[in-house]
């Protein structure tokens, strides 16, 4: 059955983990409307207000740490996401078993199909079977990544393995495939609509990619390999955040000569007293990368911060080896060829061509960005001044970026006339940005975000906000659970998780106890899409005046961009309301799924949008436009280097998944990584084994180029529809009705041809790839 993994934006902290430039603000003199009382803003900015609204879930959370409290799950109004089974980890097991039994009944029903009348509903029956499986698998993916209860997490892993294996078994069920082939062959007679036919073809591709036409022993081997890949992949993901060592030893003599005494005083020494134990996580190593003048110290710290354990490299090697074996088993030359079938890019050659088209121009731009830092380095170290791009790239190392960038940023701040000591984030509290997103969506799509109080037991943490998505015509069209605040043990990587897809109700579907149901303007019921947005924003204490202080989340521009990105996925899930769940929302081609989210980044960088949503947390005044424009210019610091980093990661993903042999010991992932870094030669890393920390190698195997590909597409759509007016309802409707609402139910190349008014794109050929790759600016 068709599956789509959760989508998210992983900020890889190789070079771009921390903003170097602290910008100051000046507010417009004209008073603005005080928006402090707006309900959406208030539930995110006023924690005491939220605690009062959600007191039952806070009380529940407190009782878990006491001997007395809620006595049993019967005291809960509901379970997670209003699924009554999900009141406990044991309830997840029961829900999995319930779904398994339901899936068995559906398979038996499908296997017994004989008449043409029964065949008419076959694709919908398959979609229902997929829905039953995916609602467990997607749920478990979310729980094991986010839930604070370890028992819940462990149970989710077990339930995921069970249902994932069942899904792979069904993907090799010959009877199911034969019936689908017959159904598609007789589609005209059966009266299937275009969405059913599209869904059927996608499902048939899934069967074929599972070796359905192979011998039984090969199909069994496919199931085994798929299961092993799933398990080792999750193990790989779970360990990407860990460094190789928690500290490194650097001599006291060297450190004392080049590091601020205050920083040194915060570090322990080893038993000999001759070496500092420099931590490789937390703020100290980042501080040293920004402030330490000695390149040897910076190199050692940077390398350890970006290195993982040997065991993690073994996990990655095993993952790649298993994928090669699976691809070979099913007749493909390599995993990239196997994986790209059915994607927009179609072949590894097309992907490589697209990436190479970006390399030359982006390298030149990156070298130009690095030149001032390289000149500064040459002046401070007494080396020859670099003039050519090659000389700049030869001189600059990845551990130089933060140090020389900080010096340059400090000089800029000292010469700036805008410095009043207050961060620009004062105008962008989390509540302000959420309200701004709602206002933007109302203008361009006709929908708004409305806060709702969750029932007791509905969320996994009391600080999770439930947000209802309301359409101006259809009313409630979806539900978002916003888990946006930092929490101990929580993943730092922002993500969008699909918990439940939008779809029409199935024929004779009576039991709706485990789903949330909506009713459209025509009175038709449908399964509400349910998603979770996960971020890790930090609380700070702010001065509200008159001696009052309050905890609040104030967002930097990169964090605003993150939130807009994830909200782009959310809008795709909410607006992609198809008949069938297999093609709803983000269930589309992997190299198309990032488009709506990356387009939202353009809105997040637009001065007009940011100015319209800004509101100082205390005064309510909007941010001065000129200050914002200056800040936007400063915020572009090394943006082409960041793009080139994405190119390098995309190439790494392709090179690892283009391997076509699995001889024991023949895959040296570190050597491949270092060779690639040296070839591409922008801030090259030939010291660490960072490839083992690149988590997207699992979730986006052979498809990481999608970020750059969709960046290029988003740039063209922005220029075509929103550059002149980001609040234009006509063009917003064109994007909504021409692309978002179809989810994966139409060919993405056709959808692009419609929204870009370029009919030739519908073919999805080499010309189309060149057209998309020809992006001069804006990526």
From Swiss-Prot:
EC code(s) of this entry: 3.4.24.59
InterPro entries: M3A_MIP, MetalloPept_cat_dom_sf, Neurolysin/TOP_dom2, Pept_M3A_M3B, Pept_M3A_M3B_dom
UniProt keyword terms in alphabetical order: Hydrolase, Metal-binding, Metalloprotease, Mitochondrion, Protease, Transit peptide, Zinc
Catalytic reaction list: Release of an N-terminal octapeptide as second stage of processing of some proteins imported into the mitochondrion
Names of the cofactor(s): Zn(2+)
Cofactor remark: Binds 1 zinc ion.
Annotated CDD domains: M3A_MIP
Keyword Mitochondrion among record annotations: yes
Single GO MF descriptor: metalloendopeptidase activity
Subcellular location: Mitochondrion matrix
GO terms, biological process: peptide metabolic process; protein processing involved in protein targeting to mitochondrion
First and last residues of the transit peptide: 1-27
List of residues binding Zn(2+): 565, 569, 572
Active site (catalytic residues): 566
Top-level taxonomic group: Eukaryota
Main location: mitochondrion
Pfam families in the cross-refs: Peptidase_M3 (PF01432)
GO cellular component term of the entry, any: mitochondrial matrix
Function as written in the Swiss-Prot or TrEMBL entry: Cleaves proteins, imported into the mitochondrion, to their mature size. While most mitochondrial precursor proteins are processed to the mature form in one step by mitochondrial processing peptidase (MPP), the sequential cleavage by MIP of an octapeptide after initial processing by MPP is a required step for a subgroup of nuclear-encoded precursor proteins destined for the matrix or the inner membrane.
Family: Belongs to the peptidase M3 family.
Annotated protein name in UniProt: Mitochondrial intermediate peptidase
Organism phylogeny: Eukaryota, Fungi, Dikarya, Ascomycota, Saccharomycotina
């Amino acid at each position: 059955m068709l599956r789509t993994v959760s989508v998210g934006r992983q900020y890889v902290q190789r070079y771009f983990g921390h903003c170097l430039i602290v910008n100051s603000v000046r507010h417009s003199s004209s008073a603005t409307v005080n928006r402090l009382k707006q309900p959406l803003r208030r539930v995110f900015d006023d924690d005491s207000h939220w605690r009062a609204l959600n007191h039952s879930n806070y009380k529940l959370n407190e009782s878990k740490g006491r001997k007395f409290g809620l006595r049993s799950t019967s005291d809960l109004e509901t379970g997670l996401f209003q699924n009554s089974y999900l009141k406990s980890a044991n309830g997840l097991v029961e829900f999995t078993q319930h779904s398994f039994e339901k899936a068995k009944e559906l398979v038996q029903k499908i296997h017994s199909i004989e008449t043409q009348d029964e065949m008419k509903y076959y694709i919908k029956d398959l979609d229902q079977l997929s829905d039953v499986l995916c609602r467990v698998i997607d749920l478990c993916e979310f729980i094991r990544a986010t839930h604070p209860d370890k028992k819940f997490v462990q149970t989710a892993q077990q339930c995921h393995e069970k249902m994932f294996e069942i899904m792979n078994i069904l993907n090799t069920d010959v009877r199911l495939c034969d019936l689908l082939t017959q159904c598609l062959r007789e589609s005209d007679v059966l009266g299937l609509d275009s969405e059913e036919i599209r869904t059927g073809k996608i499902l048939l591709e899934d069967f074929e990619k599972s070796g359905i036409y192979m011998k039984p022993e090969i199909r069994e081997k496919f199931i085994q390999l798929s299961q092993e890949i799933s398990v080792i992949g999750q193990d790989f993901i779970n360990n990407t955040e860990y460094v190789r060592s928690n500290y490194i030893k650097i001599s006291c003599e060297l450190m004392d000569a080049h590091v601020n005494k205050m920083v040194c005083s915060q570090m322990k020494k080893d038993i000999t007293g001759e070496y500092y134990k420099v931590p490789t996580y937390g703020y100290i190593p980042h501080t040293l990368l920004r402030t330490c003048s000695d390149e040897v110290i910076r190199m050692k710290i940077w390398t350890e911060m970006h290195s993982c354990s040997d065991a993690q490299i073994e996990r990655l090697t095993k993952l790649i080896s298993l994928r090669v074996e699976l691809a070979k088993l099913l007749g493909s030359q390599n995993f990239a060829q196997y994986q790209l079938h059915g994607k927009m890019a179609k072949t590894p050659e097309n992907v490589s061509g697209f990436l190479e088209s970006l390399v030359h121009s982006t390298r030149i731009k990156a070298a130009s960005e690095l030149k001032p830092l390289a000149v500064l380095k040459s002046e401070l170290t007494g080396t020859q001044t670099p003039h050519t791009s090659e000389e700049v790239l030869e001189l600059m190392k990845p551990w130089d970026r933060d140090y020389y960038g900080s010096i340059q940023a400090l000089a800029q701040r000292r010469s700036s006339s805008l410095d009043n000591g207050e961060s620009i984030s004062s105008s962008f509290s989390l509540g302000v940005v959420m309200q701004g997103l709602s206002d933007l969506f109302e203008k361009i799509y006709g929908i708004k975000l409305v806060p709702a109080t969750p029932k007791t037991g509905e969320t996994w943490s009391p600080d999770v906000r439930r947000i209802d998505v309301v359409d101006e015509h259809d009313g409630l069209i979806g539900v978002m659970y916003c888990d946006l605040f930092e929490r101990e043990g929580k993943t730092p990587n922002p993500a969008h998780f699909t918990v439940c897809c939008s779809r029409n109700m199935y024929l004779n579907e009576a039991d709706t106890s485990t789903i949330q149901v909506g009713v459209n303007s025509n009175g038709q019921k449908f399964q509400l899409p349910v998603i979770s947005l996960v971020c890790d924003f930090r609380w700070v204490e702010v001065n509200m005046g008159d001696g009052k202080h309050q905890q609040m989340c104030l967002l930097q521009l990169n964090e605003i961009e993150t939130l807009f990105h994830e909200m782009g996925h959310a809008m795709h899930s909410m607006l992609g309301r198809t008949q069938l769940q297999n093609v709803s929302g983000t269930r589309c081609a992997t190299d198309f799924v990032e488009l709506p989210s990356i387009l939202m980044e353009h809105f997040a960088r637009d001065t007009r949008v940011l100015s319209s949503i800004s509101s100082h947390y205390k005064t309510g005044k909007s941010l001065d436009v000129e200050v914002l424009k200056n800040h936007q210019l400063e915020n572009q610091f090394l943006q082409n280097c960041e793009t080139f980093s994405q190119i390098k990661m995309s190439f790494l993903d392709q090179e690892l998944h283009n391997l076509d042999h699995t001889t024991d010991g023949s895959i040296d992932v570190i050597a491949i990584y270092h060779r690639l870094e040296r070839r591409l030669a922008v801030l090259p890393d030939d010291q660490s084994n960072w490839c083992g920390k690149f988590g997207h190698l699992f979730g986006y195997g052979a498809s990481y180029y999608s970020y750059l590909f969709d960046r290029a597409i988003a740039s063209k759509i922005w220029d075509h529809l929103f550059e002149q007016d980001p609040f234009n309802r006509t063009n917003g409707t064109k994007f909504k009705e021409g692309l978002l609402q179809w989810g994966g139910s139409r060919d993405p190349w056709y959808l692009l041809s419609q929204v870009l008014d370029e009919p030739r794109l519908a073919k999805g050929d080499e010309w189309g790839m060149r057209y998309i790759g020809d992006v001069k600016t804006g990526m």
